[in-house]
Amino acid sequence: MSKLSDKAAFQKELTDLEDLYREATGKEMAKFYRPPQGTYSEENLKMAKELGYKTVFWSLAYVDWNNDAQPSREQAFAKLLPRTHNGAVILLHSTSRTNAEILDELLTKWKDMGYRFETLEELFSDK
């Protein structure tokens, strides 16, 4: 997406995703944009904003996306737990076998560490 400079093409990428989301869930997709791979251009950010999207970056990620080289449970915890911080936006890829296996325990550990979880809608709402 970072190479898309044509607003119509950029918008089509997002509206196609919105359509797929609606088809899969029966709901409208929240207007948040995470630049794939964290790669973006100033033009992308401007177009996303003009289309009503809030751009959100992650503050913590690890190499969980490679299905042929999944981290072990121990490696995942060693990467994630010490790097977690207040306000963290943590990127966990849904295609990761390791993430699926450790998610319940990971969330429990974070709760035990005093963290709470909110949706992006909750984080950006006027409280």
Task: Give residue spans per PLM region.
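Alpha-helical scaffold elements lining the catalytic groove of polysaccharide deacetylases
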Residues: 1-25, 39-86, 99-101, 105
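A short coil-to-beta-strand element that immediately follows conserved catalytic motifs
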Residues: 27-32
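Conserved, mostly hydrophobic/aromatic
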Residues: 33-36, 48, 55, 90, ...
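Active-site-proximal beta-strand/loop segments in catalytic clefts of secreted hydrolases
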Residues: 34-38, 58-61, 92-96, 120-123
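C-terminal domain-boundary segment and adjacent tail
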Residues: 98-127
